Regions:
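Non-catalytic cap/lid and distal C-terminal segments of serine-dependent acyl enzymes
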Residues: 1-266
Length: 266
């Protein structure tokens, strides 16, 4: 059935962007790692510089999740063609710091067993994130200003977005938390998670253009998000809030992407 929200997820007769898998060096992690990069229609021929949106997956996902399950390329193609979103580059990272790439992939082309539990929420992803930005800004035609960078993620990726954006308060003017986990795991000793209140004060003191929080009414992280919003409210920090029906599901995360992307780089 045509019409409505589902049209944004379809391959329509509009100009299509390009999706590429790229390997980059992460000196912080001592690894060659893989990212997925969406460039908008016309990137190859325009000569223009573009803003960049870093889009992060949740627990159990990798750099393929937002393309395969999130319909990111279709959503961006359609929003850009409709004039609702600015043409932008979207960079999808792998938040499992022990992995080079999605299971079964390696920089040597060898199949690697995915046995160990990857490092996920202990500071490695956050501390190594500048390596990704350095690669993108060295290899793509991009605007290299805070006002031209956005970061958002779902669940664990929302957690990473929260902590990366407060750790590097001059990096992102647009932050999106989709069904985000909020607090680090008990016993986590990474300096990334220390002095959270002071870091938030610095971040919000620099007045990000958009700090957007979205969650479903029956999401198991709902209460965590209520508590986090109370902290922001108590300190007078400005954010926008979007509440949907339903829980911790891709149906919601796709909706959040369609709401968030049009607000970027305005």
């Amino acid at each position: 059935i045509k019409g409505g929200q589902g049209d944004l997820y379809s391959v329509n007769d509009v100009p299509h962007g390009t999706v590429a898998r790229r390997w980059y060096e992460s000196p912080t992690l001592g690894k060659t790692r893989r990212i997925t990069v969406y460039t908008p229609a016309g990137y190859e021929t325009s000569g223009k510089k573009y803003p960049v949106f870093y889009l992060l997956h949740g627990m159990g996902g990798d750099e393929e999740a937002w393309i395969a399950l999130g319909r990111t390329a279709q959503i961006l193609d359609n929003l850009i063609a409709q004039g609702k979103a600015k043409p932008m580059i979207v960079v999808m990272t792998n938040g499992n710091a022990d992995q080079e790439a999605a299971p079964g992939e390696s920089s040597l082309g060898l199949v690697k067993p995915n046995m160990q539990l990857p490092k996920t929420m202990e500071g490695s992803m956050e501390s190594s994130f500048p390596d990704v930005i350095k690669f993108i800004e060295s290899n793509y035609r991009v605007e290299k200003k805070k006002s031209n960078r956005a970061i958002a993620g779902l669940s664990m990726g929302g957690f990473h977005s929260l902590h990366i954006s407060k750790q590097y308060p001059d990096m992102f003017d647009y932050v999106g938390l989709f069904s985000a986990a909020i607090l680090p795991r008990e016993g986590s000793e990474s300096p990334i998670y220390q002095n959270m209140d002071e870091k938030l004060k610095v971040q919000f003191g620099k007045h990000p253009k958009l700090y957007w929080i979205a969650i479903g009414k029956t999401d198991f992280l709902y209460k965590n998000n209520v508590d986090y919003r109370k902290k922001l409210d108590d300190n007078g920090y400005k954010y926008e809030y979007y509440e949907s029906d339903g829980g911790h599901i891709w149906k919601n995360w796709r909706i959040y992407l369609t709401k968030f992307a049009p607000m970027l780089f305005k």
